[in-house]
Amino acid sequence: MSIKAEEISTLIKQQIENYQSEIEVHDVGTVIQVGDGIARVHGLDNCMAGELVEFSNGVLGLAQNLEESNVGIVILGPYKDIREGDEVKRTGRIMEVPVGEELLGRVVNPLGQPVDGMGPVLTSKTRPIESPAPGVMDRKSVHEPLQTGIKSIDALIPIGRGQRELIIGDRQTGKTSIAIDTILNQKDQDMICIYVAIGQKESTVRGVVETLRKHGALDYTIVVTASASQPAPLLYLAPYAGVAMGEEFMYNGKHVLVVYDDLSKQATAYRELSLLLRRPPGREAFPGDVFYLHSRLLERAAKLSDAKGGGSLTALPFVETQAGDISAYIPTNVISITDGQIFLQSDLFFSGVRPAVNPGLSVSRVGGSAQIKAMKKVAGTLRLDLASYRELEAFAQFGSDLDKATQAKLNRGARTVEVLKQDLHKPLRVEKQVAILYALTRGFLDDVPVEDIKRFEEELFMYLDQNHKDLLDSIAQTGNLPADEDMKGAIEGFKRTFAPSN
């Protein structure tokens, strides 16, 4: 079959007429120096602060220092293959993370990429990791309780939805355990939890994930992890990624709890980045804006007004102290930003008081207005009782001939300390907390030997579940204390069946 010359010329003409050349314009620069996870790039004159840039090997970077002749970029990934002279491309995007319900039950890194081996996260929604905190008129005062399930916290240092409560203490004093128990207690509370692990060991994070999975809490939890082996920029970004994921739910009218474990490691990572970027160091070699680092993060926790949907985001930041020194730089910064702190003391922890909450140095500045009425009534005198017990305890060591009132205070104090102890991963429903604290503050435990208190508590709960379920349900539903005679009758009825061990 022969093709005629005219046909060929017609085909060529058609091809030429249909040819379209699309011009792709990229703003590119050149790496002039690279090392320690930082690249200096020349030629990105129009780059925005916090913009994502892409290196020629596909690794992303974050523009941090915008200087006269170059841009300081922190590299968000392996930097060994990046060389001087490599091309760097602007993306035109500010750093953002994927958000949405699809993330629930997943373990992701601060870039929103899954690290749990369960396939990709199928969400198309994203949010910028840096966004302004809700304004004054968009907020509402904290008035709903966030039940942690931990007696010593719910009674003495209550937390409300939308509050920021610092958990501070030395290493190995049970900070993470408090967070895990709080997350476990949010089951059936219509609460979404986000656990941000910053600079933790991979094995520790795995342990936390398995604990949450075992108790069925992973279904409403997102775990964001930047482990100790990750580059410093990822440790710095992790909390912002976590709060961005939480804000998506908050602005949709839901309630969110975000745990930052812990912000000391984020501050250390930020110090490392700042020094490598040649920013001037300040106190303890931290950069001048280390306060702003944490304040802009924690200000994003809020209880939104009804006009904005009434959602809330509660923050539980952790700070690790050295030898109990809460007056160091980062601890004082975060104490001044948050609405109260829970101080965990290693002396108490090692003497068997767990959770090791020090009620004298712990405070909740707004949670009191969120406490349910029943708890307010039974826990009103607890803090004073404990304080006077600690004071008298010191004197009691020197003298044996104590008057009856002092002896009674010491007895009540010892029983209070015992009641506030709690086992790991066993959060208590608020109605049961009210029941045991009622028994304590109304004197029903004064004649129960201290070593029997724990058994008394367990058996009391079993007795109430079987015989007085209506009392517990009434506290849970109304938030009010049932009539005194009903409570007294129930506890006296149980005491008649309780046999002390000696």
Swiss-Prot record:
F-type ATPases have 2 components, CF(1) - the catalytic core - and CF(0) - the membrane proton channel. CF(1) has five subunits: alpha(3), beta(3), gamma(1), delta(1), epsilon(1). CF(0) has three main subunits: a(1), b(2) and c(9-12). The alpha and beta chains form an alternating ring which encloses part of the gamma chain. CF(1) is attached to CF(0) by a central stalk formed by the gamma and epsilon chains, while a peripheral stalk is formed by the delta and b chains. The gene is atpA. Its EC number is 7.1.2.2. Residues 117-139 are annotated as: Disordered. This is ATP synthase subunit alpha. Belongs to the ATPase alpha/beta chains family. The keyword Membrane applies. The record marks 362 as: Required for activity. Produces ATP from ADP in the presence of a proton gradient across the membrane. The alpha chain is a regulatory subunit.
